Regions:
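Catalytic cores of RNA-modifying enzymes
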Residues: 1-218, 243, 263-266
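An accessory alpha-helical subdomain
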Residues: 196-202, 207-240, 245-248, 253, ...
Length: 267
């Protein structure tokens, strides 16, 4: 049986002589209601293939498997191997104890579609999700719990304070939304920040996707500069290119939608 409360997780770790790693940013999910909500928004049904990143103490891992999913779970902390092996015994769960940042998911994941379910610290979450959106087409749905401010960047609208490159990448490759917010007290130990679950459903890559993201990266690298300056290194004549698609050279990257960057990519 998987741990569902802070006390159960603390007891399980203590029994194995373990404690959460501050270095790894470990905050283990310890709330059955939040676990059920994640399983629901992920659309888990029998036969669904789930890539779980950050299995931790297995609270979500076991819930996914109990709902009928085939779970391939990655956990960077090999100390947790006996814990996860204990709580997932008899379930359709395949465990890997490696750093996911060193795994070529496009090669490792066979067939599809896959649903990524993850509880990620900031330093891992953003680059991992951006890479998977761009390069791992077999992942059809992303259900990712991260620090709230980070999660909101993937679903932000042009002109908002959270809007940036993650928003554009998500806007090009998926339809993103914040499913719900998660308070600190549902974790063990409790983090100092709120979290949120962002859901992204993949859409077919449109023409110009790679170029559009390159343009967005250049624009947000100098986000306070007007496009005519921030894109000077990627267009021979940026003013003409920008105007050719009905945009203003005095605009900034934060003013452009994903669709705007796609139009500009084809200029």
């Amino acid at each position: 049986m998987s741990p569902q409360t802070r006390a159960e997780i603390a007891g399980l770790l203590e029994r194995h002589g373990l404690s959460p790693s501050h270095r790894l940013g470990q905050n283990f999910l310890a709330d059955a209601n939040i676990t059920r909500k994640i399983v629901t928004v992920a659309g888990i049904q029998p036969g669904v293939q789930v890539l779980e990143i950050g299995a931790g103490t297995g609270t979500l891992t076991t819930a996914l498997a109990d709902a009928g999913a085939r779970v391939v779970a990655y956990e960077v902390d090999a100390r947790l191997a006996p814990v996860l092996e204990e709580v997932t015994a008899g379930l359709d769960v395949e465990l890997h104890f490696v750093d996911i940042m060193g795994v070529d998911l496009a090669k490792e994941l066979e067939g599809g579609p896959w649903t990524m379910v993850a509880n990620l610290p900031y330093n891992v979450g953003t680059p991992l999700v951006l890479d998977a959106l761009r390069n791992v087409a077999v992942i059809a749905r992303f259900v990712v719990m991260m620090q709230r401010e980070v999660a909101e960047r993937f679903a932000a609208s042009p002109g908002s304070k959270d809007y940036g490159l993650p928003s554009v990448v998500a806007g090009i490759h998926a339809r993103a939304r914040i499913a719900f917010r998660v308070p600190p007290q549902v974790f063990f130990p409790a983090p100092s920040v709120d979290s949120a679950v962002v859901v992204m459903d993949r859409v077919p890559a449109p023409p110009g996707a790679v170029r559009a993201i390159e343009l967005a990266a250049a624009g947000f690298n100098q986000r306070r500069k007007m496009l005519r300056r921030s894109l000077a290194g990627v267009f021979e004549d940026p003013v003409t290119a920008i105007r050719s698609v009905g945009l203003e050279p005095t605009s900034r990257a934060e003013d452009l939608s994903a669709a705007d960057f796609l139009r500009l990519a084809l200029a």
